[in-house]
Amino acid sequence: MPKYRSATTTHGRNMAGARALWRATGMTDDDFGKPIIAVVNSFTQFVPGHVHLRDLGKLVAEQIEASGGVAKEFNTIAVDDGIAMGHGGMLYSLPSRELIADSVEYMVNAHCADAMVCISNCDKITPGMLMASLRLNIPVIFVSGGPMEAGKTKLSDKIIKLDLIDAMIQGANPNVSDADSAQIERSACPTCGSCSGMFTANSMNCLTEALGLSQPGNGSLLATHADRKDLFLNAGKRIVALTKRYYEQDDESALPRSIANKAAFENAMTLDIAMGGSTNTVLHLLAAAQEGEIDFTMEDIDRLSRKVPHLCKVAPSTQKYHMEDVHRAGGVLAILGELDRAGLMNRDVDNILGLKLTETLNQYDIMLTQDEAVKKMFRAGPAGIRTTQAFSQDCRWDTLDDDRAEGCIRSLENAFSLEGGLAVLYGNMALDGSIVKTAGVDKDNLTFRGPAKVYESQDTAVEAILGGKVVAGDVVVIRYEGPKGGPGMQEMLYPTTYLKSMGLGKACALITDGRFSGGTSGLSIGHVSPEAGSGGLIALIEDGDMIDIDIPKRSMVLDVSDSELAARREVELARGDRAWTPKNRERQVSFALRAYATLATSADKGAVRDKSKLGG
């Protein structure tokens, strides 16, 4: 029978000092035999996805204590990728994931907490907490802050739906008036919550459902809706029961590595492909799998991408649907239900509810359930009122979207495409793979051949695009933006956005060893591995080299002879200590970022730290 971790600090005469300090936090004699559960919050006023979380930890804590546990809350950092975008701040985004994972480990292990409730929401916070959960392997429940409502405004006598990406595109479009641009900006992000499309934050919060670590509705129920409060209240109750299952009943099925096993990771990736999730999810799932010592690799992702259909198309791949529409159509479990009926789900997986997948679908898939309370929850909709307050409205759709032929979520027979929304491309440019969000690629662009225009930073690429130096047919190559070469693997949202602003969204391709925002669409290929900073072939491309992209064949090839590439490699190696670094780039890189770069692996490994360099 496992012993409560917290007993290390709460039992025995030698721990009198620790108990004295616990008493100073409000604990009493009666508390010293109870499980101590960490409420891992991420409130900050910097991030709209987290601005409403201040009091939500207290909600969870009250339920923990009412259910027989002791709750202790702490906060992690949280970076807003949208605000950090387009300047040096983006260098810090991906490295913040490792800091979040480490900070959770530090707090939980230093204080011997028995379990966790992770209150996350945005891009690197959910992945960081997920990595920590699988590293620590103690009972955990995830409950996120929820999606933002979609923006709406009236332009040219027509009501249109908006999100952050629209504000960025139209802000750089020379054909859009200042007045219209300002109106779009003011309407794009109307409420608290993670940005309203299937961007990285919402993708990851959906994936925690598929992994079995969060409750039904976690990925899609709006941040502003009163129903979301129940997720927080129930998380507090359920974590105590989950904790006691492990420590008092010796039930290892309550642990995250038992729940989020390889079969669950395959289910999560299958969901991601089917819903056209952010390419960043590939990085984060690979990283989390390594923390949990789960054998889940790029090869698994490639295998799944070839057989999973695209069943749900959401912004940025279309402006018709946002997360509020996914929820109305039944959310994550509706997509999993369609995938299950297509024979694509691993059914023998558990979740924090203590249910198998089939049991969960019978209760929560709107196409199967007879539970009116479940159907009511999925009718939770937007209010269209600007607010930073959680649970501030209780509006509902009159009906559910159960149209699996032409609705937001499709059946296999009516799939948007029989191949899913993400694909892994290989070739001499990416021996270890690269990622493209096929959900956002126009059908006419699935194959592309063009000359390279090479840039050694995002900044110079943006300058060239806005300056008219990139023309139709070009393949924009942005290198030395990988985990090591950046460092920090910046998102290339501005270059892809500005290609659209300049009318080149379907006329050019973009390839990078950096990554993309979940808001990116178009022929944008990222995560090229090995990266330029690690000696990858992307470092040897020259202006004018022809590049062939063939998504159906999963291929990306630089059309340059092996002998020429060998000669270029010799020239690069002759640079000595400066080899595999950008030639003409001025960038201030702090000591903290240099430390990250020293240990960073390429994207095919999840951009995690290289344990071999630490003797691991």
From Swiss-Prot:
What is the active site of this protein? S517 (proton acceptor)
Q: Which cofactor does it need?
A: [2Fe-2S] cluster; Mg(2+)
Q: Which GO terms describe its biological process?
A: isoleucine biosynthetic process; L-valine biosynthetic process
Q: Name one Pfam family in it.
A: ILV_EDD_C
Instruction: Give the sites modified to N6-carboxylysine.
Output: K124
Q: Which GO terms describe its cellular component?
A: cytosol
Cite the binding residues for Mg(2+).
Answer: D81, D123, K124, E491
tRNA-binding as a keyword?
no
* GO molecular function annotation: 2 iron, 2 sulfur cluster binding; dihydroxy-acid dehydratase activity; magnesium ion binding
Q: Which InterPro entries match?
A: Dihydro-acid_dehy_C (IPR042096), DihydroxyA_deHydtase (IPR004404), DiOHA_6PGluconate_deHydtase_CS (IPR020558), ILV_EDD_C (IPR056740), ILV_EDD_N (IPR000581), IlvD/EDD_N (IPR037237)
Pathway, per UniProt? Amino-acid biosynthesis; L-isoleucine biosynthesis; L-isoleucine from 2-oxobutanoate: step 3/4; Amino-acid biosynthesis; L-valine biosynthesis; L-valine from pyruvate: step 3/4
Q: Which UniProt keywords apply?
A: 2Fe-2S, Amino-acid biosynthesis, Branched-chain amino acid biosynthesis, Iron, Iron-sulfur, Lyase, Magnesium, Metal-binding
**Which Gene3D superfamilies is this protein grouped with?**
IlvD/EDD C-terminal domain-like
The UniProt entry's coiled-coil ranges are none
Q: How is the cofactor bound?
A: Binds 1 [2Fe-2S] cluster per subunit. This cluster acts as a Lewis acid cofactor.
Question: Reaction catalysed?
Answer: (2R)-2,3-dihydroxy-3-methylbutanoate = 3-methyl-2-oxobutanoate + H2O; (2R,3R)-2,3-dihydroxy-3-methylpentanoate = (S)-3-methyl-2-oxopentanoate + H2O
Record-annotated residues binding [2Fe-2S] cluster?
C122, C195
Which domain of life, per UniProt? Answer: Bacteria
Q: What is its EC number?
A: 4.2.1.9
| Subunit architecture | Homodimer.
Q: Which family does it belong to?
A: Belongs to the IlvD/Edd family.
| Role played | Functions in the biosynthesis of branched-chain amino acids. Catalyzes the dehydration of (2R,3R)-2,3-dihydroxy-3-methylpentanoate (2,3-dihydroxy-3-methylvalerate) into 2-oxo-3-methylpentanoate (2-oxo-3-methylvalerate) and of (2R)-2,3-dihydroxy-3-methylbutanoate (2,3-dihydroxyisovalerate) into 2-oxo-3-methylbutanoate (2-oxoisovalerate), the penultimate precursor to L-isoleucine and L-valine, respectively.
**Protein name, please?**
Dihydroxy-acid dehydratase
Q: Which gene encodes it?
A: ilvD
